[in-house]
Amino acid sequence: MSSDTSDSRPPNPDTKTASTSESENPAIPSPKPKSGAPLRNQDWWPNQIDVSRLHPHPPQGNPLGEDFDYAEEFAKLDVNALKADLTALMTQSQDWWPADYGHYGGLFIRMSWHSAGTYRIHDGRGGGGQGAQRFAPINSWPDNVSLDKARRLLWPIKQKYGNKISWADLLVFTGNVALESMGFKTFGFGFGREDIWEPEEILFGEEDEWLGTDKRYGGGEQRQLAEPYGATTMGLIYVNPEGPEGQPDPLAAAHDIRETFGRMAMNDEETAALIVGGHTFGKTHGAGDASLVGPEPEAAPIEQQGLGWKSSYGTGKGPDTITSGLEVVWTNTPTKWDNSFLEILYGYEWELTKSPAGAWQFTAKDGAGAGTIPDPFGGPGRNPTMLVTDISMRVDPIYGKITRRWLDHPEELSEAFAKAWYKLLHRDMGPISRYLGPWVAEPQLWQDPVPAVDHPLVDDQDIAALKSTVLDSGLSTGQLIKTAWASAASYRNTDKRGGANGARVRLEPQKNWDVNEPAELATVLPVLERIQQDFNASASGGKKVSLADLIVLAGSAAIEKAAKDGGYNVTVPFAPGRTDASQENTDVESFAVLEPRADGFRNYVRPGEKVQLEKMLLERAYFLGVTAPQLTALVGGLRALDVNHGGTKHGVFTDRPGALTNDFFVNLLDMGTEWKTSETTENVYEGVDRKTGQLKWTATANDLVFGSHSVLRAVAEVYAQSDNGERFVNDFVKAWVKVMNNDRFDLK
């Protein structure tokens, strides 16, 4: 392997590279962790939760400052001028990185796809919403070879438009423009993605080598990808295009395709549309010996200025480019939208061959079609070629049925690809209210739509009256608080899904989630619905209250009463404006992935879960976007309020349950209590009097972590102090309101 570096500095010694792989990049160097590296606290004590995960993207790292308002800056952008500049860029081939066929469209489509395509449904992480492709590890994934060049091609445009367009939006929008520049009619586009300024630690796999697969598949007969992963292979976006583990089996590859694209919320038709549509353009690159490619951007020498994979094969660019190690041109019109991909896929029989770099691919059998595929730089015509995963679109019975239909009805492919591409680019952005710009398409089911407000909202007098009504309804404060939490706590800050807006807690599937205690919901919701109906029937001026608003308002009223019972007078801020979604506009299957495996705030864990409870509590806190102090305040407050799942008393360290007090912290930190593992109940601890041995409390790890974890204990000590009872109550209220308003993007 040659790193092809200048003599001024050696390659980065912190990353070693491997030159053997059975993956998409058969010999392109991949990073390996440095042995003997200094250990972090997490390395010494891997079972301790890392609460720093709750504080990603600190404002100190943002060069634009905390007051920067991207939506406000974007409003100044001439989007048509930006689009025109991007369209012009497509055919402005640069000598330092020449365009295939004189058009950068294929490269930019891949850039946008690989930016958005990291999204995964099980935890909502990934996607193009933050411009993460600029940072490690994604900028150095083996699957992203040469995308560093694509981003550098965009720099003059980013420099020109400045803060008015984020990198996150630009990376995704450019692919959309690329499609349109080659004759495709897209479905629309929404701006609104805000940049991050440093990478976030995301678990993309437990393998200690890129291109590994050994830690994400179980040993069962059926190959099944572990949750929450969205890719078959460490460092790839979806699947190995040579087939599973580099074995060129199109049918086996179809299984992997279906699973990984499903992890991105795509069904079979959407998956086929993306592959067929995306592979209508451009080519792959495997011109020669991949061992001649240098290290990835994060390991490249400093003088390469963030560009990686410098190749010493020929010129290292243009006709000598090595990106994936595969050398495939799918169609005879690689810069034009048409149906040629399917015409060629079904127009030939195919035989297994290898690229010049040694990667498995297919070529039209017996020399058929020789010379019909144009060379990207004017060389002799080529034979038709396809990836192993392209052949999957023909031989898999389900994909084959879909693609054969499109072969005869190309207009159906155009519509399917347009909608699937739009979904791909926007899946992690949350509700349509977050979209900016003039080209936003009509709401789609996968965006979890809620109706617009079409009536006057309740005022302060109405709010006070409704609070009084719910407190006199016969429902307990605990029932009201639990229902409000159940409604709001489905929110995921990763992909901005879930939350109280829409009142989907009353709909399938949420109303039957075990964590939400369906039987109790069935008691509480009808009472609140009657209050809503009575108010709406009698309110003056056409004012109405949605059930979504009333659920949150009822929880607020209950907290105010609980605080008063604890000796504190507080007002829980409330902002009306939520509306009620319909079952018709709620995709049950799509929402199923939001069901919590555990919710430590309610001391709930799904039967059979073996992951440490405190780790799942931290994950839930991360989804809710709360800080370590907010996490601490919320758990302590909810325990004092006695709102555990199923009414258990674990962590209810108080002799006045239901009152909002700091008793949880006072009693947790009481050295008169000794904690022991329960001998009879899994995941339960017993707190006994040190002198008498008498049982005082029971708890789970969700409770005791606030005494055992040094960072969380430091916060708990603040709230346990004799002078901080009121501070705790106020902090709890602020954290509660944050959770209730997480999905109120209209307030932000």
Swiss-Prot record:
Feature type site, description Transition state stabilizer: R110
Alphabetical list of InterPro entries matching this protein: Catalase_peroxidase, Haem_peroxidase, Haem_peroxidase_sf, Peroxidases_AS, Peroxidases_heam-ligand_BS
Protein modification: Formation of the three residue Trp-Tyr-Met cross-link is important for the catalase, but not the peroxidase activity of the enzyme.
Compositional bias of kind Polar residues: 1-24
Cofactor list: heme b
NCBIfam families named among the record's database cross-references: cat_per_HPI (TIGR00198), PRK15061.1 (NF011635)
Role of this protein: Bifunctional enzyme with both catalase and broad-spectrum peroxidase activity. May play a role in the intracellular survival of mycobacteria.
Assembly and oligomerization: Homotetramer.
UniProt similarity note: Belongs to the peroxidase family. Peroxidase/catalase subfamily.
Stated name of the protein: Catalase-peroxidase 2
Organism: Mycolicibacterium smegmatis (strain ATCC 700084 / mc(2)155) (Mycobacterium smegmatis)
